Amino acid sequence: MNSVTVSHAPYTITYHDDWEPVMNQLVEFYNEVASWLLRDETSPIPDKFFIQLKQPLRNKRVCVCGIDPYPKDGTGVPFESPNFTKKSIKEIASSISRLTGVIDYKGYNLNIIDGVIPWNYYLSCKLGETKSHAIYWDKISKLLLHHITKHVRFLYCLGKTDFSNIRAKLESPVTTIVGYHPAARDRQFEKDRSFEIINVLLELDNKAPINWAQGFIY
């Protein structure tokens, strides 16, 4: 692991070597906006804004991307809910349960699945207000997601409205799937088969499929 310093909390960002090419720009962009971000109480706390930068990228095949953290109790790991109370991760787990037949589980975490990096486009929000920090993170968000898409084969974005123009923001030739948000109305996410489709496409590309059942916690 490497680390860099920034002028505001969290003051130190620890990161895996695979993120090295974007770190100088990240530090510059963060120092420009941090004082505005940190006027608010945030979800997650600043010490957890950049926790996913500790993840390697070269061993990832799929990025599962949400728009921003939970408005309360964000951990810095997208979709993670240690007490398994958040609707989004519960719906994701239900979807994987239907796909895999696994039923006796107590939680689910995308961050423990080989080949997968969960990501949030915006890395924080004001406590209780989803997408409230979008304007501050925008430059950083584009920088980091573009870097991720240089490594993964598939970008799976959860939220048809939030990610309607995501392809226009990407320069890498990554296959992008935009599906329903897990909390979408009328239980639309239940009909979404993107996890299954990703594995079909990986196999067509002669890549190993994702073992989505690996995310279950027992």
Swiss-Prot record:
Subunit structure: Homodimer. Interacts with protein OPG148. Component of the Uracil-DNA glycosylase(UDG)-OPG148-polymerase complex; OPG148 and UDG form a heterodimeric processivity factor that associates with OPG71 to form the processive polymerase holoenzyme.
Role played: Plays an essential role in viral replication as a component of the DNA polymerase processivity factor. Excises uracil residues from the DNA which can arise as a result of misincorporation of dUMP residues by DNA polymerase or due to deamination of cytosine.
Any one GO MF annotation of this record: uracil DNA N-glycosylase activity
Keywords associated with the record: DNA damage, DNA repair, DNA-binding, Hydrolase
Disulfide bonds: none
UniProt KW Hydrolase keyword: yes
Protein name: Uracil-DNA glycosylase
Species name: Variola virus (isolate Human/India/Ind3/1967) (VARV)
Family named by the database record: Belongs to the uracil-DNA glycosylase (UDG) superfamily. UNG family.
CDD domains referenced in this protein's UniProt entry, alphabetically: UDG_F1_VAVC_D4-like (cd19372)
Gene3D superfamilies: Uracil-DNA glycosylase-like domain
GO BP term (any one): DNA repair
Enzyme class: hydrolase
Active site: D68 (proton acceptor)
Entry superkingdom: Viruses
Chemical reaction(s) catalysed: Hydrolyzes single-stranded DNA or mismatched double-stranded DNA and polynucleotides, releasing free uracil
EC number: 3.2.2.27
Cross-referenced InterPro entries: Ura-DNA_Glyclase_AS, Uracil-DNA_glycosylase-like_sf
